[in-house]
């Protein structure tokens, strides 16, 4: 199944969190926080203004992005857990 977000929405795959700290302590699954970093899978066509013009999004597929801890809605596409969020929930592009 292919999924295409509408308007200014973005589909993001979370990047897996580190298994251990910089000091070498292994973090159990129950103590891990969900990462606020991910890879853009798909983007919508853009934000629609009141006059009908469409402004394209700044992010594109395969961009590595940072987003707020509580951003987006979790969805399952082809058995994979992904996030769908508005572009404004994205804090920035890495690299």
From Swiss-Prot:
GO annotation, cellular component aspect: cytoplasm
From the UniProt record, report the name of the gene that encodes this protein: groES
State one Pfam family annotation: Cpn10
Record keywords, A-Z: Chaperone, Cytoplasm
Q: What does this protein do?
A: Together with the chaperonin GroEL, plays an essential role in assisting protein folding. The GroEL-GroES system forms a nano-cage that allows encapsulation of the non-native substrate proteins and provides a physical environment optimized to promote and accelerate protein folding. GroES binds to the apical surface of the GroEL ring, thereby capping the opening of the GroEL channel.
Question: Superkingdom, according to UniProt?
Answer: Bacteria
Write down the SMART domains for this protein, in alphabetical order: Cpn10 (SM00883)
One example of the protein's molecular function in GO is: unfolded protein binding
Q: Which NCBIfam families match?
A: PRK00364.1-2 (NF001527), PRK00364.1-5 (NF001529), PRK00364.2-2 (NF001531), PRK00364.2-4 (NF001533), PRK00364.2-5 (NF001534)
Protein name in UniProt: Co-chaperonin GroES
Biological process annotations from GO: chaperone cofactor-dependent protein refolding
Family to which the UniProt record says this protein belongs? Belongs to the GroES chaperonin family.
Q: How does it assemble?
A: Heptamer of 7 subunits arranged in a ring. Interacts with the chaperonin GroEL.
Task: Please indicate if the UniProt record lists Chaperone as a keyword.
Answer: yes
